[in-house]
Amino acid sequence: MKGGSDIVFDIEKFAVHDGPGIRTVVFLKGCPLRCLWCHNPESQSFEPERMASADGKSPPEIVGRSMTVGEVMASVRKDKAFYDNSGGGLTVSGGEPLAHFDFTRELLSAAKAEGIHTAIETSGYAPRERIEALLPLVDLWLWDVKAPPAIHEKLVGCPAEPILDNLAFIASRGASIVLRCPLVPGVNDSDEALAHIRRLSEETPGVVRVDIEPYHPMGEDKNRRLGRADWFRAPFATEADKARWRAAIHQANQR
């Protein structure tokens, strides 16, 4: 099997934070959003990019390479025994996998045909018909909640309403959902923002967990290595920040 091709910038093996069990996470390159705090800025462009080495001495690397569905599946299926023993599987991430619809659909379909559990990590910003087409192929939706509607476009680069409409749609169709919430101190962690997360977790059928993802500055170094002139900076989350977030969201089973 060869199948269609797309630009992949990483394949992470033995991942344990992107769905249940031991997983392989396939990162597709290209995203329509521009989150200020993005920790993988090399995922934004839809084309391969040159990135300086971390030590500044080694040759630069090219981030992203064209791979077929068959090539990706050859890597994914190597660890099927681990998936079967741990309840794991394949997670498609990005970038934004819904912006790579044909490749994502073909890859998920291939995994399902081999009995591999599937998850997709997504912002939910995509035409409804794409999401509807993927519903039979996705066992778990890892759905980003980045900011409340009032400040969403300012921080992320797109309106929140289509994302919230799509979330309500998959919930109405019986999807299993994990809400993933990147929180940046002083940026998107206001009382209003935390109340928005709590409401979604309580009112959206199918939400099995809320994952809080505290900001970390990984993206700062990557932006520098990509040669970008300016980039976002924010403080690390303190333990007090994290405790406040957990208390406000009131999710006993969050990570």
Regions found by a protein language model. Name each.
Residues 73-219, 224:
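Conserved AdoMet/S-adenosylmethionine-binding subsite of the radical SAM
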Residues 60-67, 95-98, 233:
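Short coil/turn segments at secondary-structure boundaries
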Residues 1-20, 185-255:
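Auxiliary Fe-S-binding modules of radical SAM enzymes
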Residues 1-68, 78-86:
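N-terminal [4Fe-4S]-dependent radical SAM core
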Residues 58-62, 154-159, 226-234:
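Short glycine-enriched, charge-decorated loop/helix-capping segments at active-site entrances
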Residues 58-61, 69-80, 228, 239-248:
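Short alpha-helical interface patches
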